[in-house]
């Protein structure tokens, strides 16, 4: 098992280039199932989750060439509609293949998913929506077994669901007739999926709102143009927090600040200033790091995927911060590890109270999920001494070239074998 050794530091400086968004690339790669031509996708991050998804598509018969952050996908050779447990267990997003496979072939089997151990994350919203579109769904021996010809319908999501929205948008693309989706997720990653489908000729109205109308092609495959994945707003937010926790000036390149409005607003409340251009954000040090109150919610609210990083940052604030996690239960697993470093954090259900301004000390800590592991790295940057972060396979699922990027900012960080 590998781990990261990180030396605490008072200062970062320099530029960091932000990679393509993993959470945008995953549904975009899956959407190639809806397509008759070879698809070229640029700015695809080279992270473990992407490699898992590519191996799943290859297992279904697709031809994929992935190098230099560019993916060439040909799904004309698909000869399988069973997404096997061996691959799906590694990553929850594999469930995204359910809608497109069913829409294209009229039947499929997808193993119930694995991935981050955060809460229950049920997929029943996906299944209920597909049933409303005429699918016959059964759960057999750990697999979702789906069949039927999909027809458009009006579907209201009881809860906002990002992967659920993406799954049903893709299913509706090849369904017969109009599908109206209500309470759709508005995340930038969902918006890009809709825009790519629209560029391919699909009639889709309401992009960027919580109501979509999709006029399905009744089984006729789409033709995609070449496109690039949007920048990763969560990676960008993580590096902004790295600059903030060391109260340093750093610049993010290849970033879209409009996707980070809620994160930037909280940094400004904490006393930091930013200089923003069309594709860069420069973070300027704060005279005093102030405490903050955060409540996670769906986009355009504060993203749950940035909650752990801001908890680490709040440890440096002069006062008491409150974080209210509204989206997932069991998403405070990083707290016990931060306590090992001297953090003063109290939990009451889904609310965390963080008393800042206390010295952090280096420690051996263990990552529990993707975003929690980035919080531990941030805390290690602010701690006195050299910390070791274990189970970093979580980080490799979502952060591209993490050590190289941190080294470029002046961090002493080394990957070692246990």
Curated annotation (Swiss-Prot):
Pathway: Cell wall biogenesis; peptidoglycan biosynthesis. It catalyses: phosphoenolpyruvate + UDP-N-acetyl-alpha-D-glucosamine = UDP-N-acetyl-3-O-(1-carboxyvinyl)-alpha-D-glucosamine + phosphate. InterPro entries: Enolpyruvate_Tfrase_dom, Enolpyruvate_Tfrase_sf, MurA_subfamily, RNA3'P_cycl/enolpyr_Trfase_a/b, UDP_GlcNAc_COvinyl_MurA. Its main location: cytoplasm. UDP-N-acetyl-alpha-D-glucosamine binds at residues 92, 121-125, 305, 327. Belongs to the EPSP synthase family. MurA subfamily. This is UDP-N-acetylglucosamine 1-carboxyvinyltransferase. It comes from Campylobacter jejuni subsp. doylei (strain ATCC BAA-1458 / RM4099 / 269.97). The gene is murA.
